Structure formats: structure tokens, C-alpha cells
């Protein structure tokens, strides 16, 4: 296990451990149809709380995870961070077995201001420099251009496309793109 990061600070954002005070705004974020448009579905409050519990458990076990994103003036604005492994096979050449994923989900009030990019750069640096990960991947729905732009801005490159195995073929987000970066 890599050393646990208590906080990662950028110029405008902080990635920090979760607190119980984050649960209500996290539930609101996960219930927002705009935020969840490309996910399987909006989450109920109970589903959101269960997801937050899994995130906290992951951080406790691995020393990293999907940290709470704190923005001055907004407070809790979502999450940015790393998952230990992608829980399904990615059928794209050049991807290591059980790769680590970088991801983010932000409240609409935090969209379009560079917070995801700034937070993702902090998480990516932690993943390579502290956790010593060999490769970090990120994927999103093929039509989710804002997420693709963040992936490119943090230095990931397009590696291929795949059909998401956890979504039905008629789901708007069934087709995904995969970006990745290898350790230097």
C-alpha cells in the first residue's frame, strides 16, 4: 500500500479525505440528472451513501482513492482521484491487466472552471510518484467531450474504444473511449 495522502493541494483545489458533512451534497450531486446523464442512472440518497462508504473504504485500504474535491467558495464540489483497479477487462491493446483508473465527478456549479483538470493533475502525480503505478487509464462515454478534454489536458492519450460491459447496448453511453498514460 502506498502512503496515504491526507490532502493534495493545488492552486485552487484541494483533494482531501471525506467527512460526514460531504454526504448530503454528494447525494444531491448523484441525484442530479445533468451530472448523471452519462452514468447508468441518478442515484438515490441511500445508493449515494453506499457509494461514499465504498470510496472511504477504498482509501483506507489502498492509501488513495476518489478524494473529496474542495473548492474555496463552493466547499465540497465532487470527487477526483484514483481507483485501485478497473473491475472489468478493457479490450484495448497496450493496457495492463487490472489497470488503475483516474476519474472525477463534479457538481454543475463546478463545471467549466478547470477544477477537474487541476484535481486530476494532482491525483495523476500522486499515482505515478507516490503509489508508483505503472499505468493510469480513464474512460468516458464516446460523446462526453468535456471529459475527453480533461483526459488530454492531464497528458493521457487516446488508446481506443470499447463497449461498456456494465451498460445495456441501447444505453446512450454504451460506447466508450479509453485514454491512458504510462509511468515515465
Predicted regions and their residues:
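Acyl-donor (CoA/ACP) binding surface of acyl/acetyltransferases
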Residues: 1-38, 70-184
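Conserved GNAT-fold acetyl-CoA-binding loop/helix
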Residues: 34-55, 64-67
